[in-house]
């Protein structure tokens, strides 16, 4: 008996997911494989990917467009949360996985499949993200992961695919593993596995090297409404258009390159290269607007929430009660995060040079050291006395007694 009768496979057209089709049928006895390719703005030729899946033996090859959903339902909440895993990675790949899982489950229910499958190996984070998301959305569905079990080397995997007439896209001159969507691009493997080696320029595609960026900076004004970016330079844009324009502008100035050692959920450290031009600028601009509009107590408490939120998303717990609860808190904080932030993009740096909001808590008359100062300096002495009372009491007990 096969492991499942009908399987919906998350399909990218790459080596692993292409080989999964004949492997599921010939090695695991699956009767029917339906592939699902999701358009997340990666720029792939989806019609060619559909045709490739059918040639590889899929009964049906489907495509779902989900760029707007990825940005509006996943990236925008992450921007409101200032989500940066280990303070650096803006979760461009991690945010896409629960959406793909949701579409997998929807298609499986539509076509009457009893299982879904993905091409993740047993070493990465994506296997956890897919498996947990699917379990949360439909625990009755089986989850198959052939690449996690087949035990083939890369060369053996390619040879297996060629045996079934599948054209292999990987060339020996391009050893990198790449993931791309409209939120960003991630690269690993090859020379990048040596943590002491500078990444060659060929690794990058969305951002220019500093040497190739313009000598003159670019300025962009980003308008937010309740923490959501809605305008660039006074022009209201939809989510996709906003990301496309800002990716191009920031990337041309070298903004958004990340070279980091990150801690994977499975317990290993991994060297990753990310390019996230728009996300990098938007999170930084959003933080600047929050500093203007949120109270000190909310701002400081939210810092801890942001770390937890980033870890949840990275660790595959998007569909969890805690993530939903954190989103509810964050949405409440965003009611006054409306305004405009002016960013300067230059030589790989995105720097805030101005911010304004109708809900600004910044009062120049209280902050100034010049004429018009309305701060009551006489109140400082009493404030310091009360604020320091616990410290003085402790000192009298411990210092005064000679302890």
From Swiss-Prot:
Chief location category: cytoplasm
Chemical reaction(s) catalysed: L-citrulline + L-aspartate + ATP = 2-(N(omega)-L-arginino)succinate + AMP + diphosphate + H(+)
Gene Ontology terms: biological process: argininosuccinate metabolic process; L-arginine biosynthetic process; urea cycle
Binding site for L-aspartate: 121, 125-126
Highest taxon of the lineage: Bacteria
InterPro entries, sorted: Arginosuc_syn_C, Arginosuc_syn_N, Arginosuc_synth, Arginosuc_synth_CS, Arginosuc_synth_type_1_subfam, AS_cat/multimer_dom_body, Rossmann-like_a/b/a_fold
Keywords: Amino-acid biosynthesis, Arginine biosynthesis, ATP-binding, Cytoplasm, Ligase, Nucleotide-binding
GO MF annotations, alphabetized: argininosuccinate synthase activity; ATP binding
Associated pathway: Amino-acid biosynthesis; L-arginine biosynthesis; L-arginine from L-ornithine and carbamoyl phosphate: step 2/3
CC annotations in GO: cytoplasm
Compartments, as annotated in UniProt: Cytoplasm
PROSITE patterns reported for this sequence: ARGININOSUCCIN_SYN_1 (PS00564), ARGININOSUCCIN_SYN_2 (PS00565)
Binding positions for ATP per the UniProt entry: 10-18, 119
EC number: 6.3.4.5
Residues binding L-citrulline, per UniProt: 89, 125, 129, 177, 186, 262, 274
Assembly description: Homotetramer.
Record-stated family: Belongs to the argininosuccinate synthase family. Type 1 subfamily.
NCBIfam families registered for this protein in UniProt: argG (TIGR00032), PRK00509.1 (NF001770)
PANTHER family: ARGININOSUCCINATE SYNTHASE
Protein name in the entry: Argininosuccinate synthase
Organism: Synechococcus sp. (strain JA-3-3Ab)
């Amino acid at each position: 008996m096969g492991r499942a009768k009908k399987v919906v496979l998350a399909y990218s057209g790459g080596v692993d997911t292409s080989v999964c089709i004949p492997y599921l049928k010939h090695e695991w006895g699956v009767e029917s494989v339906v592939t699902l390719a999701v358009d997340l703005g990666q720029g792939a030729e989806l019609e060619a990917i559909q045709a490739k899946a059918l040639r590889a033996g899929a009964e049906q090859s489907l495509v779902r467009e989900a760029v707007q959903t990825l940005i509006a339902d996943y990236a925008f909440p992450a921007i409101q949360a200032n989500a940066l895993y280990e303070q650096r990675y803006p979760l461009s790949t991690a945010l896409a996985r629960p959406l793909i899982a949701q579409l997998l489950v929807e298609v499986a229910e539509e076509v009457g499949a009893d299982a879904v499958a993905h091409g993740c190996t047993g070493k990465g984070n994506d296997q956890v993200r897919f498996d947990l998301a699917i379990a949360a959305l439909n625990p009755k569905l089986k989850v198959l992961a052939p690449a996690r079990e087949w035990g083939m080397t890369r060369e053996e995997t390619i040879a297996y695919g060629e045996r079934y007439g599948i054209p292999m896209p990987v060339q020996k001159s391009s050893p990198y593993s790449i993931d791309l969507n409209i939120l960003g691009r991630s690269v690993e493997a090859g020379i990048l596995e040596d943590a002491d080696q500078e990444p060659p320029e060929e690794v990058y595609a969305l951002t220019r090297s500093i040497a190739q960026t313009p000598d003159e900076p670019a300025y962009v004004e980003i308008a937010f409404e309740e923490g959501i970016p809605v305008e660039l330079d006074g022009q209201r844009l939809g989510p996709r258009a906003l990301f496309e324009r800002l990716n191009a502008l920031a990337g041309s100035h070298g903004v958004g390159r990340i070279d980091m050692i990150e801690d994977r959920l499975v317990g290993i450290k991994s060297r990753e290269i990310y390019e996230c031009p728009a996300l990098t600028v938007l999170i930084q601009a959003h933080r600047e607007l929050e500093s203007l509009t949120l109270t000190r107590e909310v701002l400081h408490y939210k810092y801890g929430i942001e770390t937890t939120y980033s870890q949840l998303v990275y660790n595959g717990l998007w569909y969890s009660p805690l993530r939903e609860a954190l989103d509810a808190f964050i949405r409440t904080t965003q009611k006054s995060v409306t305004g405009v932030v002016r960013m300067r993009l230059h030589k790989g740096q995105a720097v805030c040079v101005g911010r304004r909001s109708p809900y600004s808590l910044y009062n120049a008359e209280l902050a100034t050291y010049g004429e018009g100062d309305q701060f009551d300096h006489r109140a400082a002495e009493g404030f310091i006395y009360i604020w320091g009372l616990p410290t003085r009491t402790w000192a009298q007990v411990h210092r005064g007694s000679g302890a």
